[in-house]
């Protein structure tokens, strides 16, 4: 894993954690994020197979336990 990948993973986990701590609906967040990736939104910057992998990474970050 590159330094940048480590940094991005940590950032994603922290953003999701902050959202959860603020009372956000994390399940809805995941659904919405996946829809943005799968639906060719303005926030999608990759093609397959990265689309599927990005959704998998979101799921891993949401389920992260220290």
Place the predicted regions along the sequence by residue.
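N-terminal acidic leader/helix
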Residues: 1-24
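Low-complexity intrinsically disordered segments
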Residues: 29-66
């Amino acid at each position: 894993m590159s330094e940048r990948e480590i940094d991005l993973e940590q950032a994603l986990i922290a953003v999701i954690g902050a959202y959860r701590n603020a009372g956000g609906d994390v399940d809805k967040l995941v659904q919405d994020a996946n829809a943005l990736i799968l639906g060719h939104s303005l926030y999608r910057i990759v093609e397959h197979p990265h689309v599927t992998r990005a959704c998998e990474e979101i799921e891993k970050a949401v389920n992260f336990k220290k």
